[in-house]
Amino acid sequence: DLIPVRFEEAWFSYNSEPVVRDINFSITPGEFAAILGPNGSGKTTLMKLALGLLKPTSGRVLLFGEPAESFTDWHRVGYVPQRTQATESRFPASVREVVNFGSYSGFNPLAIFKRKDSSRVDEAMEMAGIQNLANRRVSDLSVGQQQRMLIARSLVRQPDLLVMDEPVAGVDAAGEEQFHTMVRRLNRDLGITIVLVSHDIGAVMR
């Protein structure tokens, strides 16, 4: 298998000021990895470089052997943002409708949902432990339930790599424990490569 994430002498600068300096590391298939650091330490920049949202000033960042900034095989990559988008919380969408978005092809918002993938939606909600919440309004969910909904959405494509940005921020202790149990299962049983971005080393080490 190709290495999911590789940084090779990667530098990145904002306004000529280096933020990421000569970074070299690889995340191998099936690995559970974490990018840790306090706010302002550059971990979000590293994540954006890994996902091709930023291009390194020099050096290379590779996703499955391809330059991250020109990577196109996005069904292999799942991304879980830190919080539910405000629009998803305001509009009367159900959990199932939000998870359905994971089946859209590419990142085209006009792409047609493929009905044949509806079974994947059910499987993803079950893996995230929210199958009993399918018809609930997003606005009625707790923070922890919303986070599991976003994870389910990212799992519909059956990704090889799952990147999570501060996944337990604002989640209570019970929700955090459920999250860690679920993520360990995804990594151990399905072999998904997991990358957690967090400022809290305790949350990662649990």
State where each predicted segment sits.
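Conserved ABC ATPase "signature" region
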Residues: 100, 115-133
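The feature captures the beta-strand-to-loop junction immediately N-terminal to the Walker
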Residues: 36-38
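Conserved ABC transporter NBD signature motif
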Residues: 59-73
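Catalytic Walker B motif of ABC-type/P-loop ATPase nucleotide-binding domains
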Residues: 162-165
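Helix-to-loop junction immediately C-terminal to a conserved catalytic motif
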Residues: 51
